[in-house]
């Protein structure tokens, strides 16, 4: 099975140690003590983000490791072949993808995805799996960029957390930049299985993921079936 868990916001970077969505990710591997690989490229390998990652995952029954691109880079193919799950941190989506492409990590991730490694991440780490995404890589405005395209469609994280997100998605729909857009609120994730089975995972308080489109000129937000991790 091919799986992507795209988190709209929250989790390890914001509430280190809680571990709700992180345990959910580990559970999808089907392993008793899975190996998980953290990729914090989007923040330039932020030390604080790595601390939060280990604070969370060290409390869970797994083997957590991370990748540094801005030190001496290890054998990527060997490391990725040992993983059951990948977790990509948030930050600058555009810069992250450029680094990955230069190192060939995008191709290695695709191979791992196709062989059943669970792909996950938050914000930039959610954007990257789709064909295109709404990103804040520029200081002054939200833009749409091409991503890796493991799954078809467009994605917007932080849908309820940042005031410019909803109106920007509306504008992209009106301008025919998007036909539809997947969007996840903070503390919600969109779990996609085999590219056609969608589930919204709520690890906050009634947080949701949507399929957003224009219907007769008005924005339509259709909520996906949801699973709450707090009940």
Locate each region found by the language model.
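C-terminal and late-domain segments of enzyme folds
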Residues: 1-33, 43-51, 58, 85, ...
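Glycine/Thr-rich phosphate-binding loops of Rossmann-like dinucleotide-binding domains
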Residues: 14-15, 96-97, 130
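Catalytic-core regions built around general acid/base machinery
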Residues: 24, 79-82, 103-116
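A glycine-rich, hydrophobic loop/mini-helix early in the fold
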Residues: 39, 44-94
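Hydrophobic anchor at the start of a short beta-strand
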Residues: 64, 119, 208-211
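Catalytic nucleophile loop
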Residues: 87-90, 113-132
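Glycine/threonine-rich flexible loop motifs
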Residues: 93-103
């Amino acid at each position: 099975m091919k799986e992507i868990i795209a988190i709209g916001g929250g989790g390890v970077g914001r509430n280190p140690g809680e571990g709700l969505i992180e345990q959910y990710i580990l559970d999808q591997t089907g392993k008793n003590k899975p190996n998980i690989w953290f990729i914090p490229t989007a923040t330039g390998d932020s030390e604080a983000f790595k601390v939060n990652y280990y604070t969370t995952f060290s409390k869970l029954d797994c083997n957590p490791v991370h990748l540094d691109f801005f030190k001496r880079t290890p054998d990527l193919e060997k490391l990725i072949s040992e993983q059951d799950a990948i977790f990509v941190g948030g930050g600058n989506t555009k810069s992250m993808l450029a680094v990955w492409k230069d190192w060939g990590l995008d191709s290695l991730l695709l191979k791992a995805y196709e062989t059943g490694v669970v792909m996950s991440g938050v914000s930039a780490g959610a954007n990257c799996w789709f064909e295109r995404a709404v990103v804040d890589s520029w200081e002054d405005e939200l833009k749409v960029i091409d991503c890796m395209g493991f799954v078809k469609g467009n994605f917007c994280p932080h849908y309820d957390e940042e005031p410019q997100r909803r109106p920007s998605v509306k504008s992209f729909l009106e301008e025919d930049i998007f036909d539809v857009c997947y969007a996840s609120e903070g503390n919600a994730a969109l779990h996609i299985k085999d590219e056609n089975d969608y589930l919204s995972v709520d690890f906050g308080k009634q947080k949701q993921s949507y399929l957003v489109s224009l219907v007769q000129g008005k924005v339509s937000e259709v909520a996906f079936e949801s699973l709450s991790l707090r009940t």
